[in-house]
């Protein structure tokens, strides 16, 4: 994607590990930001 070389898709074995590492951090982060943002609007 960064280097325009469509003949070698095999040069991305790290893509799955990188996707997994990004999403294991990004998914709970988005969840907690959404939960904290929702708590701002809850009046007791």
UniProtKB/Swiss-Prot annotation:
One of its GO terms (biological process) is photosynthetic electron transport chain. InterPro entries: PSII_cyt_b559_bsu, PSII_cyt_b559_CS, PSII_cyt_b559_N. GO terms for molecular function: electron transfer activity; heme binding; iron ion binding. Heme binds at residue 23. It is found in: Cellular thylakoid membrane. Its cofactor is heme b. GO terms for cellular component: photosystem II reaction center; plasma membrane-derived thylakoid membrane. The chain crosses the membrane at residues 19-35. This b-type cytochrome is tightly associated with the reaction center of photosystem II (PSII). PSII is a light-driven water:plastoquinone oxidoreductase that uses light energy to abstract electrons from H(2)O, generating O(2) and a proton gradient subsequently used for ATP formation. It consists of a core antenna complex that captures photons, and an electron transfer chain that converts photonic excitation into a charge separation. This is Cytochrome b559 subunit beta. It comes from Microcystis aeruginosa (strain NIES-843 / IAM M-2473).
